[in-house]
Amino acid sequence: MHAISSAAPAPSVRLPFYRQLYFQVVFAIIIGVLLGHFQPEYGAAMKPFGDAFIKLIKMIIAPVIFLTIVTGIASMSHLSAVGRVFGKAMAYFLTFSTLALVVGLVVANVMQPGTGMHINVAELDQTAVKGYVSKSHEMTLTGFALDIIPKTLISPFVGDNILQVLLVAVLFGVSLAMVGDAGKPILDFLDGLTKPVFKLVNIVMKAAPIGAFGAMAFTIGKFGLGSLVNLAELVLTFYITSAVFVLVVLGAVARACGFSVLKLIRYLKAELLLVLGTSSSESALPSLMEKMEKAGCSKSVVGLVVPTGYSFNLDGTNIYMTLAALFIAQATDTHLTLGHQIALLLVAMLSSKGAAGVTGAGFITLAATLAVVPEVPVAGMALILGVDRFMSECRSLTNFIGNAVATVVVSRWENALDADRLHRVLDGEAEFLPEPERAVEPVVLARHRA
C-alpha cells in the first residue's frame, strides 16, 4: 500500500490567463459564433474541426476507462468493495435520475410552455424526425442489456460503447485481484501505462479550442442566431429548470457532503466550456476522471462511478425528456391524465438509461419514450427539432455536473475521499498541491484522516 506524501509541494507559477484552457475555449467559442453569424457558409464548413476533436476524444476514452478501473479494482484490499461502490452508485443514480424526471414533469405542468400553440399534428412535416424514430425502435430494454456484452474482449476498444469497456475492465480487474501476487507484474505494467495515457489526454485537450470553434461555428452557421430565440419559452424554461436543479438539488446534496457545488463548477470550468462548445459531455470524460482524482476522490471510485454515470446518471437528459414530452402534448392539445403522466415517467426511467453522452442521444431517447406512450404524438417532435440542438448544450452541461457531484458523494459514502485535499483544490490551490498517489486505496485514505 502507498502512503500519501507529506512533503511540501514545490511552488508553481500560475499560467497567464491567455494560456489557460478555459480562456482559450471561451475565445474560440466567441470566434466561432461570429464566423457562423457573419459568414454562415464558412461557419458551416468548420464542422470537420469539431468532428475531428470528438474523434480524438473517443480514441482515448476506452484506454482511460480500462486502465483506471483495472488498476483501481486490482489495488483494492477487498473485492467486496467493488460491489459496494457499484451498489451505492446505482442507488444514487436511480434516486436523482428519477428526481430529475419528476422536476421536468412538475415544471411543465406549472409553466405550460406549449399551451396556446394549437398545432395540428397532421400538418407537421414528419420527415425530419423519421431517422430518430427508427433509431428509437432499436432501443429496447433487452437489446440494451445484451448490447453491454461485447462479442470479444477486444471489440469494446474498437467500438464506442462505454458500458462494454466498463464490463471488460471490471471483470479483468476482479480477475487480476483474485490471482494475487501472480498478477503483480501485470498490475505494475498497467499502472505504468496509465501515466503516458493521461499525458496523451493532456496533449489532446490542447486541441479543445479548435474543436469548440469548429462545433460552434457550424451550429450558428447551419441554424443561425435566429434559431436561438425560436420557441424561446421552451428553451428558457429548460435552462432555468436545469440551473435550479443544479444549484438547489445538487447544491443541497453537495452541502450535505461538505462541499460547494459552485466551487466544484469553478474547478471544472474549462471542461464545462468544452462541453458547451461541443455539445457533448463525452468530450470531457477523460479530463473529468483525471480532475476528480486530483480533487481527492479514490481512483477506484472514479473509475466505476464516472463511466457508469454517463449512461445511468443523465440528470439533464431526464429533465429534458419529461419537459419536452409535455410541451409536445400541450402544443398539440393532447390531454394527459395523471395516469398518463405517471406512465410517461415510468417509461422514461427505463429509456433514459440507454442514452449515451453524445450529441443527439437525448432526442433519440425522447423518440423511444414517446413511441411507448401512444397518447403523445411522436410527430410532434418536429416542433422542437429546430431548437433541440441548443437544448443539447444544457443537457450535456447538467449531465456533466451531475456526474461530478455523484463522484464526490459516492467517494464520501465510501470513506474514500481526501476531504482536506478536496477543499484545498476547490479553493483554488490545485497547482500548489503534489500529484495524488494514483495507486492509493480507499482504506488508506480513511486511515490517513483518522
Swiss-Prot record:
One of its GO terms (molecular function) is fumarate transmembrane transporter activity. It holds the Pfam family SDF. InterPro entries: C4_dicarb_transport (IPR023954), Na-dicarboxylate_symporter (IPR001991), Na-dicarboxylate_symporter_CS (IPR018107), Na:dicarbo_symporter_sf (IPR036458). PROSITE patterns: NA_DICARBOXYL_SYMP_1, NA_DICARBOXYL_SYMP_2. GO terms for biological process: L-aspartate transmembrane transport. The chain crosses the membrane at residues 25-45, 56-76, 90-110, 162-182, 200-220, 234-254, 319-339, 367-387. It is found in: Cell inner membrane. Keywords: Cell inner membrane, Cell membrane, Membrane, Symport, Transmembrane, Transmembrane helix, Transport. It comes from the Bacteria. SUPFAM superfamilies: Proton glutamate symport protein. The keyword Cell inner membrane applies. One of its GO terms (cellular component) is plasma membrane. It is a multi-pass membrane protein. NCBIfam families: PRK01663.1, PRK13027.1. Responsible for the transport of dicarboxylates such as succinate, fumarate, and malate from the periplasm across the membrane. Belongs to the dicarboxylate/amino acid:cation symporter (DAACS) (TC 2.A.23) family. This is C4-dicarboxylate transport protein. It comes from Acidovorax ebreus (strain TPSY).
